[in-house]
Amino acid sequence: MAKRTKKVGIVGKYGTRYGASLRKMVKKIEISQHAKYTCSFCGKTKMKRKAVGIWHCGSCMKTVAGGAWTYNTTSAVTVKSAIRRLKELKDQ
């Protein structure tokens, strides 16, 4: 069978419905939510989304709460770096 979604990718299932700009937004979200992420516990690229905000590693079998569409949210990364920086200041 011929490849039908060269430009639109994963949002080809919507056809011509909902408008091009909305489909582009949804494409970005759907690509990130279906991607595999690196597990912060075992380091393998096995972290997959189970449900909204629930992520499961197929290697070490850990289940963690994360972002709705991505494993790490921007605010979580900011908080994690701030905590790490404060721990370093405390140790000095």
Curated annotation (Swiss-Prot):
Keywords assigned by UniProt, alphabetized: Cytoplasm, Metal-binding, Ribonucleoprotein, Ribosomal protein, Zinc, Zinc-finger
Keyword Zinc-finger: yes
The protein's assembly and partners: Component of the large ribosomal subunit.
Species: Gallus gallus (Chicken)
GO cellular component, one term: cytosolic large ribosomal subunit
Start and end residues, zinc fingers (C4-type): 39-60
Similarity field: Belongs to the eukaryotic ribosomal protein eL43 family.
Name this polypeptide is given: Large ribosomal subunit protein eL43
Parts forming coiled coils: none
